[in-house]
Amino acid sequence: MAEIKNYTLNFGPQHPAAHGVLRLVLELDGEVIQRADPHIGLLHRGTEKLAEHKTFIQALPYMDRLDYVSMMCNEHAYVMAIEKMLGVEAPLRAQYIRVMFDEITRILNHLMSLGSHALDVGAMAVFLYAFREREDLMDCYEAVSGARMHAAYYRPGGVYRDLPDTMAQYGETSKYRSDKELRAMNDARSGSLLDFIEDFTNRFPACVDEYETLLTDNRIWKQRLVGIGVVDPDRAKALGFTGPMLRGSGVAWDLRKTQPYEVYDLMDFDVPVGVNGDCYDRYLVRVAELRESNRIIRQCVEWLRNNPGPVMIENHKIAPPKREAMKSNMEELIHHFKLFTEGFHVPPGEAYAAVEHPKGEFGIYLVSDGANKPYRLKIRAPGFAHLQSLDEMSRGHMIADAVTIIGTQDIVFGEIDR
């Protein structure tokens, strides 16, 4: 009798559902997965090593390019680690701005996750709906930093600039936008950035309802997600899960509540948790987080309206002087020149700072030898821990379910390969 061998199949890295450059070697018995072996490193750019040859400020833009869907949250952990070592604290207004943009980033990330997960499984419409709202939030990024993605907006000691009083307007009509649509878009952008964000928070709950109408009770969506990739709470903790992956298994661990940073202890929000630990519960957790992030943004907008103030510390050894002062005062010019050529020196020591990133706990472990460059920078990427469980989560499932599991893990290779 002939020996029966399992079939080996390469999934990715060119596969559209591979979320970038995942190469997955699947061992199959018929169509049932026996083993899944992820091969990583195809997007390795040596970020940790590059940072050792740049000043603390020059290394900041590298952070945006790690998880390139949650840009400002990456920056946040990095600047928090530097501030911890310098012993400085950002002004209260800057802390509120950071929290607000962290939550805007969380919505950006979850919309991308939701849309691409649905697209992978075969529901195309949700992706188009999600990108409609992402466009508005990209405009918020652009308003404060000039860039739609890689903002470099958070700085040690605060943020780059205060929130602008005006928003850019859209130009003439095109075949993609009618006069009526253009007027509606420009009306929302006729005031300040805070007005625009407030208008968005008023509209957004109805948008989330639309996504839920398309997916939550959809029979095909539930058949594809319910009971797939189940991880129990103890195993989730043992595997190092954080974020929606851990909360989907029923563990209410959220750094914003358990180890509050910035002004999260002043915010009123809930931590959604799942029950069954399957792909469907993780989807429900992310949808609930969209609503909670919207709540937090509203609270930040209300506070920021009523409390003007500085957004950067006044120590010009760390933070650059204002542009007008720099061009009229010799001492300020020297500060500016020294800061952007030599940078600032961080006292010898080490610090770990972690934020509740949209994908989980994103941590920066920073070691300084007293120089103007990091001696060592270690990045704790949440997706790295989640990807290692892919083999365990997909065993016994069909090939098509591997796509569902990759989608639910919300993997981005910028942070995994670093």
Swiss-Prot record:
Domain of life the protein comes from: Bacteria
Keyword terms: Cell inner membrane, Cell membrane, Membrane, NAD, Quinone, Translocase, Transport, Ubiquinone
Function summary: NDH-1 shuttles electrons from NADH, via FMN and iron-sulfur (Fe-S) centers, to quinones in the respiratory chain. The immediate electron acceptor for the enzyme in this species is believed to be ubiquinone. Couples the redox reaction to proton translocation (for every two electrons transferred, four hydrogen ions are translocated across the cytoplasmic membrane), and thus conserves the redox energy in a proton gradient.
Family label: Belongs to the complex I 49 kDa subunit family.
Native source species: Bordetella avium (strain 197N)
Coiled-coil regions, chain positions: none
Listed EC numbers: 7.1.1.-
Encoding gene (name): nuoD
Alphabetized GO MF terms: NAD binding; NADH:ubiquinone reductase (non-electrogenic) activity; quinone binding
Broad class of where this protein is predominantly found: membrane
Class of this enzyme: translocase
Annotated Gene Ontology cellular component terms: plasma membrane
Catalysed conversion reaction: a quinone + NADH + 5 H(+)(in) = a quinol + NAD(+) + 4 H(+)(out)
A Pfam family assignment: Complex1_49kDa
Protein name per its UniProtKB record: NADH-quinone oxidoreductase subunit D
